[in-house]
Amino acid sequence: MVGGSRREHNLISKRFLSAVVLCAVIYGIHLQASSAASQGHGSITLDGVLRQLDRADKNFRSLSADVERTKVTVVVNDKSVETGSILVRGDKMLLEMKAPDARTILRTGDNLYIYTPGLKRVEEYNLAQHRSLVDQYLLLGFGTSGKDLQKAYLVTLLGERTLDGKKTAELELTPKSQEARNQISKIQIWLDESTWLPVQQQFNETGSGDYFIIRYSKVVPNPDLGDANFKPHWPKGTEKVKPQG
């Protein structure tokens, strides 16, 4: 029973971490979409990229985009892909994965919901209970300056690379806190140098060698989003659970 309880705890923790990291990724879009336009065609530097993050547009209000998430399990050479869409406004985020399996992740302040239609179940989490880990990942995005990013991560400019036909600047982030490194060893971000919007992000899991990649498309800054877009409405009969993660 103890072993079973531990496995259940690990499963809950992994599901929670996955949702938190997805939140961070989405806010990463917010951060880059808020940045100024291209800094020119000269050779880029780390300081130059960080300055772009320091110039995040204070008028940014909201965002919508399509998302593709690819999970790679190295030991069995397995690759799974899911696609969906996201809405972001302030500390609210709605991520709706549509294929191959429907799943909704809703964040409103300190509340996080994971709704699985196939199970007719919604899991409810309090982000405040995991504030240290959550803050570590959310530093990737919402309202984060280059200086704040450097406080939480060892930031390295890996160079420039053409990705999906776009010239990108590639950053590597290594978490400074041991708690974060226990989950994610490194993060890579590719930024389109013509717009400073993200093209791709990669999260490398600690120990296993597994990783997942997030690609963005159809990014629209400042769509008109109201509170109704972020209300936790679930179909009648949905089971509500609060896992202890």
Where in this protein do the model-derived segments appear?
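Bacterial N-terminal signal peptides
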Residues: 18-29
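Short beta-strands and strand-coil junctions in structured, solvent-facing domains, enriched
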Residues: 73-75, 94, 101-104, 114, ...
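N-terminal leader/targeting segments and the immediate start of mature chains
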Residues: 31-80, 91-92, 234, 241-245
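An acidic-aromatic
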Residues: 85-137, 208-212
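Extracytoplasmic
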Residues: 60-64, 81-83, 90, 100, ...
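Short, solvent-exposed helix-to-loop capping segments enriched in aromatics
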Residues: 57, 133-150
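N-terminal secretory signal peptides that target proteins for export/translocation
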Residues: 1-13
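Gly/Pro-enriched, hydrophobic low-complexity segments
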Residues: 36, 123, 133, 150, ...
